[in-house]
Each structure stands twice: as C-alpha cells, then as structure tokens.
C-alpha cells in the first residue's frame, strides 16, 4: 500500500481501499500468497490473526506485484497510435478517469500542453496506487514523451504522470502539482519505466510522494529538478522500485525523507535530501530514512539498498537511518549531514513493536551492511540481538558516537551481532560506553578529549588499557581491518539515461 510508515495516511498501511473495510473469515478463506499478521499471547499462542493483504473488494491483489489489475480504464483521451499533441489543454473531470491514456504500443508526444485532472468523487486507493487509475497521464502499453508542459490534479488518486506495465514515460522541463491523497508526482508500478529531467514537482496530499512507486515496482531515473511533498506519510521518495536520482532537490515537509521497502533500491547522487517526520505513538521511534518490510505485500521480500554519493541530508526531526524487519545495504560517501537537536540515533538496526505489524515481534530485526566511505557521522548506532549489523568505516570516515545494544524490541533475544570494522585512515570518537560483538580496528579510537578508550572483552580480557571514562566491551578484538565486504558506491553513469532528442 502507499507510503505510510507514519500510519496517518487514509488508506492504511497495506489495507485495501477504504481501510475501515473488514469482514469475518475462516481459515479456508486464507489462500497461498495472502499476507497475515499474527499477534501472540504471553504463552506464544496466536491471539489474533489479521489478513493484511487479500481481495476483499478494494482492489487489493496478491503480494509482490501479483495483483489482478484492472480490466479497463476510463479516459478522456486515449492514444493508441503515434501522435503529437501540442499547445493544447487536456482536461479530465470524471470519476477515477485519466486525462490521457497511452496504449497499444503508441508513441505520443505532449509538448507545451496544460493537462489537468479534477474530481470530487474519485476514490483513489489501491487501484490508483497500483495501476494508475485516475492519473492525469497514464502509459500502460506505449511511450509518452512530455515536455514544456504543466500537469495539475485535484482529485484522490490523481497522480501526475504514471508508468504501468509496458508503459514508459519520458518527461522534461515540466511542472507537476497534485493536491489530494494518493497522488504522487511521478509514479511507476507494475514494471513501468519513467525517466525525468529538470522537473518541478509538488504534492500536497497524504500518501503522495513526489517520486513514488508501488506494487510490482519498475524503473525510475531522475536527473535534475525539485521534488517537494507536503503531506503526512508522503516522503520525497517512496521506493518499491529501482530508482536513481541525480542533482535534485528532494524535500518532505511532513514525512520522512525516504521510505524503501523490500527488494528495491534507491541511489542518490549530488542531491539534497530533507525530511521532517512527526512523532507518532504507533511507532517505536522517529526517523529520516527508513528501510523496512511492512508485510503489506506491496514489495517482494529481499534486500533493500540505499546509496548516496555527495549531496546533503537534513534531518528536521528524529533519528537518521532506521532499518527493521528486512535485509538491507546502506552506503554513504561524502554526504554532508545536518542533524536536528533531538536526534536519537545515527543508525538504528533493530526489531520493532510497531502497531501495524511489521513482522513478528521478537523476530523482526534487520540484517544490515552499512558502509561509510569518506563520511563524517554523528550519533549513536543502536542494535539488538535479533539483528545482524556489519558496520564499515573506510577512507577517512569519522564517527562521533557510541554503539548501544538495546534489547527493547528483541523479545527473548537471539544470536545477532554488531561487527565494526575501522580502516587505518578512519576515526571513531567515542561518546559513551559501547558494546560490540567484534571490533576490527586499524584506525584511531579515542574520546572527545583525545584520551585512549579501554577495550575489554566479555571474558574479562583487556585488549587496550585506556585513560578515558568510557569503555568498549567486545566479544572479540583485532588491530587489523578487513574491509573486503564493505560496499562500493555505484557510479551515476551506471544509471544515467540519455535524454531523447524529442525532449
């Protein structure tokens, strides 16, 4: 379902359109592929079983892109053969209809057009999120080229530009504004492809990321432009696809900056990223970037990837990186980070007790490979025993913080670990007592006063005798660093797409 780790968007995390829609079912009604959340009592028995993803009339399909789709689309203008549409206005005012639909393999160029979509009766919801129902411009089988145009929507489910299935959208030098819920700026789902250059995108509703993807994923490449989301539960980028962004301004004024779910990837290059998520009692914490698995069925379970090379991150509330109930790879290289005064962590890699059911409590940690390359960092790294964290510092990276083992969301615990590897050019400035499973240090470890920090084994062995007030407790220690399993940030050239001559 739409991007709502904060849980305030109207569709509900992983719920069908109209989150209040419920019905009593039996075990016979649950089929393979349905997603269920099970709440256990103190004895480990199932207390409640809630089906989070099955067809109950709201357009909800199976997990991982196996949804049934829609039979047909209502549209004002359908283009099934090659055409150029220029210097004109395309308007849609009907319920859940498109202003322009590209089908039958057509190639359609929109040049200097004003495209609008306004409806007070549209429903939005999953059919809009997954299939593009109600989007201003939708390509399902064919290619849309959009340039020097304006796209505005004021209806639920009113995405600006949507690529679905065999549809591809190329867009440049265009302004996109959406007003209502479930209305992303540019959107790909079901394997669609969308390529954008120098756009100005603003969204104002809930579940309305400026750069948005959903069930079935796809490919999105963004080069230049400004992307702003203002609604709650509306990150600048909601990622259930493979997305690469270069030289862009990405701002979420009412949400986390980035949400990545499941087997998907986001790579940012020389971009400026800002998040401002509000605190919410449903959540265990507050974050700026989240990598997780919601169990809604909207993304295939697997390794989430976040890479950022250059640019800036500004966190206006909460901690920085939060990962839970997933596997993930995070790599930062030379990113300038601005922290808020109340930041609780730099990285939290733990299980969760989130009220929306992100995995089974006590068994929903994160397996995270984190690499800092030429990267300055501040804040604590929080981990627990149901998570696996490999934390690499290479090429002159610095960390001012502590490694904190926090079992609050680990249930009965597990055999997870936190392994820290520091190369010869990197420095850890310790700000509090720390607990690490394995420490491999070829670099420098001191406190803020330059004092040596004691490193003591859990068996009582003193590896380093220090004069600092702080102690690092380790399961094992070595004064060398093998960084071969660290992550190398990919080059933008691997994802850059040549701008078509028609744009």
Where on the chain are the PLM-derived regions?
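Glycine-rich beta-solenoid repeat tracts in large extracellular/virion proteins
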Residues: 71-78, 98-104, 123, 133-140, ...
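Surface-exposed edge beta-strands and adjoining flexible/disordered loops or tails in beta-rich
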Residues: 50-55, 165-171
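Beta-strand-rich solenoid/repeat architectures in extracellular/passenger domains
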Residues: 65-68, 81-96, 111-132, 142-157, ...
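Disordered, low-complexity segments in secreted/periplasmic proteins that are enriched in proline
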Residues: 1-34, 42, 48-71, 295-297, ...
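Extracellular/surface-exposed low-complexity segments
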Residues: 60-66, 293-318, 322-433, 442-503
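N-terminal segments that cap or nucleate solenoid repeat domains
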Residues: 64-122, 470-472, 479, 487-503
């Amino acid at each position: 379902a739409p991007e709502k780790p904060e849980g305030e968007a109207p569709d509900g995390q992983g719920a069908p359109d109209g989150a209040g829609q419920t019905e009593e079912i039996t075990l016979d009604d649950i089929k393979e592929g349905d997603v269920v959340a099970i709440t256990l009592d103190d004895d480990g028995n199932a207390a409640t079983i809630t089906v989070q993803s099955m067809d109950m009339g709201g357009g909800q399909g199976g997990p991982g892109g196996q949804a049934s789709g829609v039979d047909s689309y209502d549209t004002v203008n359908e283009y099934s053969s090659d055409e150029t549409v220029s210097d004109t206005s395309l308007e849609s005012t009907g319920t859940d209809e498109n202003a322009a639909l590209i089908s039958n393999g057509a190639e359609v160029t929109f040049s200097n057009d004003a495209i609008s979509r306004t409806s007070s009766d549209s429903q939005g919801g999953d059919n809009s999120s997954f299939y593009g129902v109600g989007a201003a411009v939708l390509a399902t089988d064919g290619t849309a080229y959009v340039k020097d145009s304006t796209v505005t929507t004021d209806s639920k489910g009113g995405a600006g530009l949507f690529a679905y299935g065999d549809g591809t959208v190329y867009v440049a030098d265009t302004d996109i504004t959406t007003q209502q819920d479930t209305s992303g700026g540019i959107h790909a789902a079901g394997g669609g492809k969308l390529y954008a250059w120098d756009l100005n995108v603003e969204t104002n509703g809930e579940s309305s990321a400026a750069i948005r993807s959903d069930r079935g994923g796809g490919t999105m490449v963004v080069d230049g432009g400004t992307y702003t989301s203002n609604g709650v539960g509306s990150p600048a980028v909601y990622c259930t696809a493979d997305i690469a962004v270069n030289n862009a301004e990405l701002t979420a004024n009412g949400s986390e900056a980035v949400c990545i779910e499941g087997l998907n990837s986001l790579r940012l290059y020389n971009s400026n990223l800002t998040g401002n998520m509000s605190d919410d009692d449903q959540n265990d914490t507050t974050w700026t970037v989240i990598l997780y698995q919601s169990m809604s069925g909207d993304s295939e379970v697997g390794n989430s990837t976040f890479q950022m090379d250059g640019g800036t991150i500004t966190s206006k509330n909460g901690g920085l990186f939060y990962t839970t109930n997933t596997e993930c790879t995070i790599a930062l290289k030379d990113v300038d980070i601005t922290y808020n005064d109340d930041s609780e962590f730099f990285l939290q890699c733990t299980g969760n007790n989130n009220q929306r059911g992100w995995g089974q409590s006590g068994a929903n940690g994160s397996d995270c490979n984190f690499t800092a390359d030429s990267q300055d960092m501040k804040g604590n790294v929080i981990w627990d025993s149901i998570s696996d964290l490999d934390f690499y510092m290479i090429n002159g990276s610095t960390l001012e913080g502590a490694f904190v083992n926090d079992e609050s969301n680990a249930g009965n615990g597990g055999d997870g670990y936190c392994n820290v590897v520091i190369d010869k050019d990197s420095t850890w400035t310790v700000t509090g007592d720390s607990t690490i499973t394995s420490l491999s240090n070829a670099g420098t470890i001191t406190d803020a006063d330059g004092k040596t920090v004691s490193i003591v084994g859990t068996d009582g062995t003193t590896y380093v005798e220090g004069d600092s007030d702080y102690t690092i407790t380790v399961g094992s220690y070595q004064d060398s660093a093998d960084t071969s399993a660290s992550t190398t940030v990919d080059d933008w050239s691997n994802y850059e797409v040549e701008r078509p001559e028609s744009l």
